[in-house]
From Swiss-Prot:
Domain Radical SAM core: 67-281
Protein name from the UniProt record: Lipoyl synthase
Entry GO terms, CC: cytoplasm
Source organism (scientific name): Corynebacterium diphtheriae (strain ATCC 700971 / NCTC 13129 / Biotype gravis)
Amino-acid positions noted as binding [4Fe-4S] cluster 1 in the UniProt annotation, renumbered to this chain: 55, 60, 66, 292
Amino acid sequence: MTKAPEGRRMLRVEARNSQTPIESKPRWIRTAVKTGPEYQDMKKKVSGASLHTVCQEAGCPNIHECWESREATFLIGGANCSRRCDFCQINSAKPEPLDRDEPRRVAESVREMQLNYSTITGVTRDDLEDEGAWLYAEVVRKIHELNPHTGVENLTPDFSGKPDLLQEVFEARPEVFAHNLETVPRIFKRIRPAFRYERSLDVIRQARDFGLVTKSNLILGMGETVDEIRDALVDLHSAGCDIITITQYLRPGPMYHPIDRWVKPEEFIDHADFARELGFGAVMSGPLVRSSYRAGKLYAEALAARGESLPENLAHLATTADGSTAQEANTLLEKYGPSQDTPVVSSKA
């Protein structure tokens, strides 16, 4: 029997989801652990200073590759989210009091880890008057202050689409402003009931109008069709999105949205080709790609597509922008060969 989340009753949608057993993964969803000197050095720094990253705590399968490039992701705003998305394992409950010292600690962690590029993400804070806008902006400011050679990507909620709150975040000038659309209009309300499809597009539009490099993500396998994915890509590009990541939904546990289908690497390649034809500046597409995966590489590619050079203080990111990556669909296809349709079945079957 599935237990209710700590601190609240199980929702009806969670009880319904729990009736579907956890699915067995296809053969192409696997990672080969390869460690290098940069990863080992990062690991020592993190354990020695008791630092915390999403990479470790979420058990990200890409930690070895990203850490080898000295990239890491931090979660801010506490452990509880004021909203609930049906794919996300972050606990939905009353958020903790705002920790105004968190920006300093995150910036010091970035310095201790000697990161080339950092991604900041976090929970929604609808309980706060500014919905957490100050926090997201201040973390960027503090990282830039203490780490002038570290790129910062700010992956934020929508701040209810309020221009004044978004403006505060924009003015901190992260290298990349990211807001994830995640899915298509037909199933959006079912998957992200507290968000709105058009509002998320408008957040991207406002960031691009401000002059920032923009980024978003689509998760496949939650019930969308191929045509709907293409339409969402068109919508994102029309809104001014520079960078797009496309990934397979992996169910965090029984209470979450059941997997509708396993998307083959060949389809991920098709979507990537379509996105490039539309004019996205940087594209990363594959089953185990995540929105912060190789983020520094994508930032460098997006600037190049704009005809811009990396800032002098971030010129070292050019060394991470060459060649393919382990989780891109074309790399998987080269490694495992042509894929076969894989039905969604219980791991207990």
